[in-house]
Amino acid sequence: MTDQPVPDFVAQERERQAAFFAARQPGEAGFEGSAYRLPPENRLSNLNPAIRDLAARYFDDNAIAWHQHAAHGLSSQVCCLNFLMPLATHPDMLARLVQSALGGDLPEMLEVEKGPDGEAWFVGFEWVGSENYLNEWPPTGKPKRGANVTSADAVLRFRQAGKMETLLVEWKYTETYGSPPQAKSEPERLRRYQAIAFAPFGPIRSDAGLKPTELFWEPFYQLFRQ
């Protein structure tokens, strides 16, 4: 008996998204000859219909940047929104989700920010925090969520075992990595992160023998900043 070949995940998901668009939104896909892509101006059609208006207003209200390929069927930003935004006003469901991921007692979900209609939201998206923890913000003004600064794909807050916790979510779909860091980016990255990368000032063990530049390879670069 021979093993069946494992289908390429990216190719498989392209086919699935193309079939989905053809069935649910006939005639809308096909941007640049790809059946799994919508025209950029139709990015909201890539969202769950129940959250399209909500997402548009939330992004506008908070001046959040849409990813360049938000109209792509394999957009991880859109995938994250489709899964988590419908739960933003359902702390009971989010509590069970957090418990299943982290274990422990059922947490009490805490408000992250207000939604477009002024209601409490228990999930935030493209989150940059309230202070310039990573030395990334512009000299004047606030950073733009989702662009040019580290932005968590989603954030949740909860209380569990008497402690308040913040959970940052890094959402992936079909991303791949392999290209080396660009040398021209190294000086600025060192300025930002060198003093805050290693314990006791950062998340990386200081006795592991790592150099700051070794953290600039993806996907480790994203993970250590969050």
Descriptions of predicted regions:
Residues 1-132, 136-144:
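Nuclease-adjacent, charged terminal/linker segments that flank catalytic cores
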Residues 96-101, 144-145, 149-155, 164-165:
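The feature marks a conserved, polyanion-engaging helical scaffold used by nucleic-acid processing enzymes
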Residues 130-132, 161, 172-176:
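Short, solvent-exposed loop/turn segments at secondary-structure junctions
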Residues 153-158, 165-173, 226:
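Conserved catalytic cores of phosphodiester-cleaving nucleases, focusing on short active-site segments
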Residues 174-226:
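Acidic, metal/cofactor-coordinating or nucleic-acid-engaging core segments within structured domains
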